[in-house]
From Swiss-Prot:
Locus of motif Bipartite nuclear localization signal: 160-177
Sequence repeat coordinates: 157-163, 164-171, 172-179
Domain of life: Viruses
Protein family: Belongs to the orthohepadnavirus core antigen family.
Protein name per the record: Capsid protein
Amino acid sequence: MDIDPYKEFGATVELLSFLPSDFFPSVRDLLDTASALYREALESPEHCSPHHTALRQAILCWGELMTLATWVGNNLQDPASRDLVVNYVNTNMGLKIRQLLWFHISCLTFGRETVLEYLVSFGVWIRTPPAYRPPNAPILSTLPETTVVRRRDRGRSPRRRTPSPRRRRSQSPRRRRSQSRESQC
């Protein structure tokens, strides 16, 4: 089966493959970041978002993989075989986990649309011949600052008019919208 873990989030393995392997922080750094930013939501029994669920699954998979690696390390007598297994896990599986963790942490931090925009921008930048591209790659944290924000009141005239005397404002106090969830997801 060829399963793309990013498909339901609007991305693909190919889209993430434009980012070089050294772009992604270490698994330890990503786990620390996830814990620092989203520990409460990740440990909560409530469903917060598909990104939280995917992040939980990636963290659990990494834990199981480390358990297996420890077992292999303790039970393989041949140092060369042990090194092959460790290198394979770190190179192949480690990269996939680092990509997954980075993607979901970034989506929770910056928003899915911003992350997808970044991946497309970086993909275009990296495929453009060096002579024709800007010297610096796009930076994820700067994308929201350069995004165009449209005003809500596009149909209104810029000058506000005072209400006509016929219309009276309601005497009841305005109601605040209360959050439907108490946990912070």
